[in-house]
């Protein structure tokens, strides 16, 4: 690997209160020659929002001055974090972490491809929590069925869990199970692991 000399691609913008402290941990989607970065943004109030930057993969072509997704439910009181997105049929499905200041939970939202590609970036529909009242983060959804089912990887600390579901519907009713845990000992991955991006 070679570090890209144009880093950092995104930095906080002091004049934007919602992203004045940190920008981090983006999910990405590629459409044509553009890469859309859905990034976690934190202001000095400590609340996380999701911003959007449109890139060619190396430089930012456009960065929206307002968040495209902001907290609006009690479970999101302290933020919407760490978006992970996939295209499923005619819509984009986003799994993210809803955080109320005490409990982090996986939540889902969707937007039609038509709305998104026409620039109607705030037309998201909240789909609900994946597993209510369970501390859970780092969720990723496979965009296609495997063996007739959708697969969600997620992290109930300290391990990576998997859930299989016949449909993308929240809350997820199917059972989930650990597929990979931390290694024992004093290793770089011995405390906790997650599915990441």
What are these regions (language model features)?
Residues 1-21, 25-78, 87-140, 144-194:
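Beta-rich carbohydrate-recognition and catalytic domains
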